[in-house]
């Protein structure tokens, strides 16, 4: 049969599968309601192709050349052109050695970038393949879950809540669907689709469940045709903007240095043309951090792979830097903070109908549950039966209403053995109570039981029933009868409390966002040690009543430990308000209605087993359950970010150091350094610095982000110091006999070739050693670097020392200085290295604002969304609050003598901030009352409460 069908036969010009009756669709596609066979599906797959959009085939060679097309590479390419075009005078041939060296350096950097990005891309593709959209398809007469890519016209598929429609299809018999087509049509509200209507690939099912027949796949779908007509736009991310800013700073620094050299060398000093060009080449070659794009890209690629090994797949690479800066995490309760393994305590079941016992309440709730594709609630209830088959024993299912976030209940219409029609429903107790229109004493009793369950951390599930005398699934039936309440217990994960404590210590405030009752949220928060300062979702409305103590909504959201009774639209509002308060927000989600909040959040996190819609909207997809995966990802992200920040400070420092140092030597002593030797320094530096992507680092104990002020200021200070150290060294070697007198080495006065050798080695050693200073938060000799970085450093400096000792290259104007001078240079470098750490501390201390507190209160270097500079004020406030409420002061995070280091200082501040977060509950009106009650031993039941309950 498959051989008799082709795309030409079913093209819209020949037949409009979107408009013709559904029965004719089956005829045109030569299929039936029994679905296709596996063999027929494979044959049609050969004819119609895979159900996915065409992927652009990227030219590998052009991609390789693309790594040479950026501002930093342009400067190096300009230097290469200068070496053979402008450096052609004074009776000397073009500088072919520098041209070849620069070209090799460019090719090496591009090759490394190309290989690493290609490997990272392949790894990401393999990981994302595991997350490829799947669909329920009827093949060989059996329903099964398959990858959406295998769908062909004629397949029968099942679409349910949370699914992304995998292909264009026509709906068969069933209840209407609510379909979100905003990604395709721009419609803001979901469209209602009935039997016979078409649904488009890429739209999202918001409500309902139905079967459909596929009419178009891949590039032939509505979405595929639209995507084929437009090219995707590449938005410039924050990371790229930072990269550009640092690159521009380095280029401007080099430009200023070259301009000063040109003005002084030619009009004032009347230097030879070729000598001047050589000096300009020194600044160009040595000052450009040509390896920066490569190092940062490789670091992120390797980091992304490590995150995936921990169970967090990054869909967007720059989400790593945002994860490092996250300071608020809004977490789901069910499945993330808890196990999502519900149990029903039969002894606590409450029965409301006179002719019903507890077993019958369980049976009714099991009938209103799915027997396949079950969620956690359905599984727990059906498993209460002796045999799960009892859920459908003796009845004929007529219609099943699946759960949806709006109605928050399921229902089944069925026929019993006597031919009578019945309907039963289970769901959120508030919805079932409203459905049954309970009043008076019955309603009061139901709420008392719900509250009693909630106080013990138990969720409630309402069960109701009705008769359907009209024997029609669409009829309203008799009034609903409230049958009973079931208690559900979802135990917290064993590691949740410890994970939340770790998050607080890392400066990440965890807020519980749950759809359960407020009392359940509070009880769970109490068990997890995350605080009970929680509010109902109604408090998110812009009205200041007694429930919030008149606190503005945005401040309430910031200070709350969580919110209960939350709907998806509330999640979006919570994220928006927190972002307005300058927080970097992470949001977890799993359902289709979580997608807006996941997109709005700085870091959208799709939890394990999330729907396709949630995964599509997220930045990070978890492959393991629980909050610990997220906290581990935060630590890893901060480590990755720390490596990138360490390198950028190093790159800026080296630019300033090369430009200022060699400019002063060239202008003060009219000494012409060899461009080729600067090229050797650059090559050895780049080879060493590549290993920083796998360096050992201590993640920041607080949320971190790009602080350009700190990067530029630290780079300028360290670079200027190293430049002055080089100038002093050159003065001592060129104009004095200091080294000869103190160390017994021969004088180098008038020996320019040997001066180039000693100057080369001095610049090489301290330039590469700088990475140990920028990579550490405390003393560089305290924080052990990675073995790979150490090996690379010593190998590079061994090569540099051998060159300085033995090299006799006339084209580079260098002659070996001997082992004596090499020993002197190493001693000088070690002595002048020590102040680098001190300068680093002074710069950070100055930028932190502590040195200026008398002039500007709490000036900080933090330029992220959140004002972390208020740490000291909050610490003082926290101490005062503890004293007021009779609490002991918090213990210090570190009790050793190394409190001088910035690491321990910042870690201590992080601990204080965590303490502040816990004390916020005491600071609120509600928290204050609870605190006084606990302190004075009052009976809270006898108090007149005027705060959120």
UniProtKB/Swiss-Prot annotation:
In terms of PROSITE patterns, this protein maps to: ATPASE_E1_E2
User: PTM Phosphothreonine: at which residues?
Assistant: 883, 948
Q: Which residues lie on this side of the membrane: Cytoplasmic?
A: 1-64, 118-246, 295-645, 696-711, 775-786, 837-949
Q: Which GO terms describe its cellular component?
A: plasma membrane
Identify which residues the record assigns to the active site: 332
Residues noted as binding Mg(2+) in the record, renumbered to the chain:
590, 594
List every position bearing Phosphoserine. Answer: 931
Read off the Gene3D superfamilies from this record.
6.10.140.890, Calcium-transporting ATPase, cytoplasmic domain N (3.40.1110.10), Calcium-transporting ATPase, cytoplasmic transduction domain A (2.70.150.10), Calcium-transporting ATPase, transmembrane domain (1.20.1110.10), HAD superfamily/HAD-like (3.40.50.1000)
Instruction: Kindly state which keywords UniProt assigns to this record, in alphabetical order.
Output: ATP-binding, Hydrogen ion transport, Ion transport, Magnesium, Membrane, Metal-binding, Nucleotide-binding, Phosphoprotein, Translocase, Transmembrane, Transmembrane helix, Transport
Q: Which SUPFAM superfamilies match?
A: Calcium ATPase, transduction domain A, Calcium ATPase, transmembrane domain M, HAD-like
What is catalysed by this protein? ATP + H2O + H(+)(in) = ADP + phosphate + 2 H(+)(out)
Chain spans, region Interaction with 14-3-3 proteins: 947-949
Top-tier EC class: translocase
Q: How does it sit in the membrane?
A: Multi-pass membrane protein
Q: Which GO terms describe its molecular function?
A: ATP binding; ATP hydrolysis activity; metal ion binding; P-type proton-exporting transporter activity
EC number in record: 7.1.2.1
Cellular compartment(s) = Membrane
Q: How does it assemble?
A: Binds to 14-3-3 proteins. The binding is induced by phosphorylation of Thr-948. Binding to 14-3-3 proteins activates the H(+)-ATPase.
Into which family does the record put it?
A: Belongs to the cation transport ATPase (P-type) (TC 3.A.3) family. Type IIIA subfamily.
Functional description taken from the UniProt entry = The plasma membrane H(+) ATPase of plants and fungi generates a proton gradient that drives the active transport of nutrients by H(+)-symport. The resulting external acidification and/or internal alkinization may mediate growth responses.
Q: What is this protein called?
A: ATPase 6, plasma membrane-type
From which source organism is this entry? Arabidopsis thaliana (Mouse-ear cress)
Q: What is the lineage of its organism?
A: Eukaryota, Viridiplantae, Streptophyta, Embryophyta, Tracheophyta
Name of the coding gene: AHA6
